[in-house]
């Protein structure tokens, strides 16, 4: 067992896998896929989900070695420590308990010796009551009109997760029916264009604004909040703010100072990281206002089902653990720096951007949890696009350029099926034909010999050859309901945690986002003094000075 100050790459389990890479270098996926027993062993089913990872560049013995790696990394203990509320976010001295946000009412999950589940449900019950008042029209705006439009202001984890879930549910029949006559929009960027787009076509009289900021000091969020407060007060007067703005925050003093009734503030806790907060009031409040709490509760139950699977299932059948170990294999041993997330569902168009943050903010680290520089890369560059759109965009590179492991996500039953008379298959079958074909195209490729048999001209054979041996996995969901969306979210959250646990890093802090904020403060002060007092640029390097000079000379901002 490695000591706390040793790097995990020095363990025998890690070194064993390093040697194993050399052993399998010449093994092609064509050969691996011909072994039916191996393929069968790489199918995992849970609660209607089917995972197929047989197209990973991993013989059976690779999986055995990866499970040994998990043991050497004390993965069982680390998962238990997370669920037990220990302060595994050591740099911020915090528990990591997003699992408590979707736990059943009778569950016991402790932080600092106290069961937090009752607190979670107090907030959920408050959200349920408030959202029902808004949706029923018993709570009205300053002019007596029902509030049918919601703008949620937040950034990063306060925006990407809720946006993903909202987009996924927009065409779900149950959610669609529940949202009739309502709109939900998300304002994140401080670019005034984002404000203009969000308020376009909306009437302040029928709009409710949800301001999401734990401290109520997040620069971008609070500037946007002040901007929409001005929009409301200009139309309805200052007293309207209390009727048209609510908060998700723990800083009740600043909430009240802003003009929002503290009774209309919904709490969350230090043990919830921003990118893991979609199951807290951050996501549950705006989503409940749009779809009703009963729909959102199903989303929470789906996530909880995966939490329980993750906590209790042996690793060889544990979907998030297997996915996490395979990601470590692809990144640290096979040297693949990226991952494509490819949902064959337009409803999941915002899934990849959310997981991009969850993954890259969590595992984009350069030191171990003990502060030692890492001699290996962690994390991967996550990107993606729904199929088949991505096929006409970046799949060319995936097939014949760099090797990029792919996650294919398919849905058995469409949210909005279409059957056209005279067509060979339904629209959804056409979509799914591509879902099933692409992983095989990546795995098998096409050889020069095959092309010769097809009488392809010699000069085109090099251009039409596909090397294959490009890894992917397939995740098949029975349908895309609120419950399934919750499952999908939790699978990826826990997968990311597994990667971090194995790499020996802290996946729950994000110091990398701080430096740019600090430097922006200096620029902000300079812009203010230059615009109001004509102060000369000072304290910047030549490059930044030149850019700032051009910006100040040519922009037409009014004097503050």
Swiss-Prot record:
Keywords: Acetylation, Cytoplasm, Gluconeogenesis, Glycolysis, Isomerase. GO terms for molecular function: carbohydrate derivative binding; glucose-6-phosphate isomerase activity; monosaccharide binding. Pfam families: PGI (PF00342). Coiled coil: none annotated. Its main location: cytoplasm. Pathway: Carbohydrate degradation; glycolysis; D-glyceraldehyde 3-phosphate and glycerone phosphate from D-glucose: step 2/4. CDD domains: SIS_PGI_1 (cd05015), SIS_PGI_2 (cd05016). The modification N-acetylalanine is found at residue 2. Its EC number is 5.3.1.9. It is an enzyme of class 5 (isomerase). It is found in: Cytoplasm. Transmembrane segments: none annotated. GO terms for cellular component: cytosol. PROSITE patterns: P_GLUCOSE_ISOMERASE_1, P_GLUCOSE_ISOMERASE_2, P_GLUCOSE_ISOMERASE_3. It catalyses: alpha-D-glucose 6-phosphate = beta-D-fructose 6-phosphate. The active site is at 361 (proton donor), 392, 517. GO terms for biological process: gluconeogenesis; glucose 6-phosphate metabolic process; glycolytic process. Belongs to the GPI family. Homodimer. This is Glucose-6-phosphate isomerase, cytosolic.
């Amino acid at each position: 067992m490695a000591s706390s100050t040793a790097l995990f790459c020095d363990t025998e389990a890690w070194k064993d896998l390093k040697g194993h890479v050399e052993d399998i270098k010449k093994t092609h996926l064509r050969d691996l896929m011909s072994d039916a027993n191996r393929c069968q062993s790489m199918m995992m089913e849970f609660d209607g989900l089917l995972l197929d990872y047989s197209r990973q560049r991993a013989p059976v013995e690779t999986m055995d070695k990866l499970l040994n790696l998990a043991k050497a990394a004390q993965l069982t203990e680390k998962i238990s420590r997370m669920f037990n509320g220990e302060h595994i976010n050591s740099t911020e001295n915090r528990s990591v308990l997003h699992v408590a946000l979707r736990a059943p009412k009778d569950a016991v999950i402790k932080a600092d010796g106290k069961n937090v589940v009752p607190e979670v449900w107090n907030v959920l019950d408050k959200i349920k009551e408030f959202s029902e008042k808004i949706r029923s029209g018993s709570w009205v705006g300053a002019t007596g009109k029902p509030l049918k439009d919601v703008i949620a202001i937040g950034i990063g984890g306060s925006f990407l997760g809720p946006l993903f879930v909202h987009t996924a549910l927009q065409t779900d029949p149950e959610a669609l029916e529940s949202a009739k006559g309502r709109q939900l929009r998300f304002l994140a960027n401080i670019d005034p264009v984002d404000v203009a787009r969000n308020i376009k076509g909306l009437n302040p009289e029928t709009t409710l604004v949800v301001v999401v900021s734990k401290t109520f000091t997040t620069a971008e969020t609070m500037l946007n909040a002040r901007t929409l407060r001005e929009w409301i007060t200009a139309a309805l007067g200052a007293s309207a703010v209390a009727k048209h703005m609510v908060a998700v925050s723990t800083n009740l003093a600043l909430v009240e100072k802003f003009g929002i009734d503290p009774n209309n503030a919904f709490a969350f806790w230090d043990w919830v990281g921003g990118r893991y907060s979609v199951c807290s009031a951050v996501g549950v409040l705006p989503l409940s206002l749009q779809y009703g709490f009963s729909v959102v509760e199903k989303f929470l139950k789906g996530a909880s089902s995966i939490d329980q699977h993750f906590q209790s299932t042996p690793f060889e059948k544990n979907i998030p653990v297997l996915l996490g170990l395979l990601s470590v294999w692809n990144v640290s041993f096979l040297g693949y720096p990226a991952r494509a997330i490819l949902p064959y569902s337009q409803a999941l168009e915002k899934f990849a951007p959310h997981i991009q943050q969850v993954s890259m903010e969590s595992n984009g680290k350069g030191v171990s949890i003990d502060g030692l520089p890492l001699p290996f890369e962690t994390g991967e560059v996550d990107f993606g696009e729904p199929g088949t759109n991505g096929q006409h965009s970046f799949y060319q590179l995936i097939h014949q350029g760099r090797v990029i492991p792919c996650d294919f996500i398919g849905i058995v039953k469409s949210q909005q099926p279409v059957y056209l008379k005279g067509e060979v298959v339904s629209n959804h079958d056409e979509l799914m034909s591509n879902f099933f074909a692409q992983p095989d195209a990546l795995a098998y490729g096409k050889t020069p010999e095959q092309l010769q048999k097809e009488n392809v001209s010699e000069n085109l054979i090099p251009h039409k050859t596909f090397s294959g041996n490009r890894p992917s996995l397939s995740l098949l969901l029975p349908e895309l309901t609120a419950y399934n969306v919750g499952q999908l979210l939790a699978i990826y959250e826990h997968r990311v945690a597994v990667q971090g646990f194995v790499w020996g890093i802290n996946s729950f802090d994000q110091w990398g986002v701080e430096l740019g904020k600090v430097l922006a403060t200096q620029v902000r002060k300079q812009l203010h003094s230059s615009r109001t007092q004509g102060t000369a640029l000072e304290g910047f390097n030549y490059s930044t000075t030149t850019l700032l000079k051009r910006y100040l000379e040519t922009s037409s901002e009014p004097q503050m």
